[in-house]
């Protein structure tokens, strides 16, 4: 039975494996990147777990072209990033130890960005 399960999961792994289409190297200061969002022809990311309150904008070569500092808030544990036509949303709701009660989603006006 174990052999059948092993063969089954090996087959699924091969069947659903993905090929890397595009790969780039980010600077070392983005070693805790936790989110990615397409924005204005570039990509936005952020650092996790108490990093600086900065959204990093980089191109498809991995070159950081802008650092958008968010001065009004602290990065407790930023985890997620999304955008629409008017706002960028940052999910500050990392809570690995279940000890935070200040979980929030930041709403940043693109006009102020």
Regions found by a protein language model. Give the residues of each.
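Beta-rich catalytic cores
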Residues: 32, 75-77
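Short coil/turn segments that connect the beta-strands within blades of beta-propeller domains
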Residues: 40-41, 85-86
């Amino acid at each position: 039975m174990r052999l059948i399960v092993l063969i089954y999961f090996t087959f699924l792994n091969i069947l659903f494996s993905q090929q890397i289409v595009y790969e780039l190297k980010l600077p070392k200061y983005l070693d805790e990147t936790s989110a990615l969002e397409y924005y204005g022809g570039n990509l936005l990311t952020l650092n996790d777990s108490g990093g600086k309150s900065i959204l990093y904008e980089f191109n498809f070569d991995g070159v950081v072209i802008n650092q958008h500092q968010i001065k009004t808030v602290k990065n407790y544990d930023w985890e997620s990033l999304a955008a629409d036509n008017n706002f960028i949303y940052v999910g500050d709701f990392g809570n690995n130890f279940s000890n935070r009660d200040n979980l929030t989603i930041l709403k940043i006006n693109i006009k102020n960005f």
